[in-house]
Amino acid sequence: MNVYQLKEELIEYAKSIGVDKIGFTTADTFDSLKDRLILQESLGYLSGFEEPDIEKRVTPKLLLPKAKSIVAIALAYPSRMKDAPRSTRTERRGIFCRASWGKDYHDVLREKLDLLEDFLKSKHEDIRTKSMVDTGELSDRAVAERAGIGFSAKNCMITTPEYGSYVYLAEMITNIPFEPDVPIEDMCGSCTKCLDACPTGALVNPGQLNAQRCISFLTQTKGFLPDEFRTKIGNRLYGCDTCQTVCPLNKGKDFHLHPEMEPDPEIAKPLLKPLLAISNREFKEKFGHVSGSWRGKKPIQRNAILALAHFKDASALPELTELMHKDPRPVIRGTAAWAIGKIGDPAYAEELEKALEKEKDEEAKLEIEKGIELLKASGMTKQGLS
């Protein structure tokens, strides 16, 4: 088997099936990543969504015996939405991050990886592979960086010269000894715009993220959102793009190369109030094909409530009151009560008191009390201004 020729053939085949960038690296242990992960774990900075076994995250040969190399791929996704609908005072909208526009990228990249695997295995019967995207054991970003796809920027995103950081990543471990590519140089320079712009200070240092403070992570949690973050997520329903949109290296980067990644504006920027009463079936039918649906409707509904509070949308108060009184989920009842207080209409004070009297869940009860205090504070402020 001529490995050099096979590499060139694989590169050409990858282009033909719509892979925007491909790179190669060894299957050696990711030693520097191991040190970083141990540090992040000790600081409590991990999200909890990662593979818990650090050795598996840094040792490809634990995942594929006799592994010799890793093939990394990247697909560029759009950064701008065509005909994006606007929020109005009576029809407020939320936003899904760009990585949740169009068809779930996990499915898109798995399809590409399957084709690449089949291509290689058609060349020789002894070829072995193991592929993964996002939810696999390896760090997609660490592999992509070492394979020369892009460099790891201060916002922790893999940034490519061609497409900026608007790329999806995946990789395939193989027993073929492909010649590794050369990593590219860091292009951040002295710029710190991403660190300065992060709404929650999650980027604690250049290249170091406290995932527990990252809005992208927080929008995916299912419990009560900590108080300090509630006013910072704005109208984000899933994910956050701030550290990407402020990056100078992303300026002018907007690629519409894959039709399946094009966003439906009514899904990527949905109306908020209809989300409050959406059924499981309706949610699955409308949002089930996008990556932002993977945690179910509860986090999206909670975030929609917080977004309505962010807008101080008084037109949503009847729906929020209905949730506070009747929703079976304490997180939704409590968050709705907090939002009612945040919106600040004194006419709803009695509804909050009624809810507090009958509420049995201690956490939800605490949120109702917060709503009452917010409403009182709002009334005092209005009196002071009058």
UniProtKB/Swiss-Prot annotation:
Domain of life per record: Bacteria
Function: Catalyzes the conversion of epoxyqueuosine (oQ) to queuosine (Q), which is a hypermodified base found in the wobble positions of tRNA(Asp), tRNA(Asn), tRNA(His) and tRNA(Tyr).
InterPro entries recorded: 4Fe4S_Fe-S-bd (IPR017896), 4Fe4S_Fe_S_CS (IPR017900), ARM-like (IPR011989), ARM-type_fold (IPR016024), PBS_lyase_HEAT (IPR004155), QueG (IPR004453), QueG_DUF1730 (IPR013542)
SUPFAM superfamilies assigned: 4Fe-4S ferredoxins (SSF54862), ARM repeat (SSF48371)
Chief location: cytoplasm
GO CC, alphabetical: cytoplasm
Gene name for this UniProt entry: queG
Cofactor(s) this protein requires: cob(II)alamin; [4Fe-4S] cluster
Protein name (database record): Epoxyqueuosine reductase
Residues forming the catalytic site: D134
Location of this chain's protein in the cell: Cytoplasm
Binding site for tRNA: Q220, K222, N280, R281, R295, K297, K298
Enzymatic reactions: epoxyqueuosine(34) in tRNA + AH2 = queuosine(34) in tRNA + A + H2O
Residues annotated for cob(II)alamin binding in this entry: R57, C97, D134, S139, D140, R141, S152, N155, I158, L169, S216, C240, D241
A molecular function GO annotation: 4 iron, 4 sulfur cluster binding
Annotated residues for binding of [4Fe-4S] cluster 2: C198, C214, C240, C243
Any one of the GO BP annotations: tRNA modification
Residues that bind [4Fe-4S] cluster 1: C188, C191, C194, C247
Organism classification: Bacteria, Bacillati, Bacillota, Bacilli, Bacillales
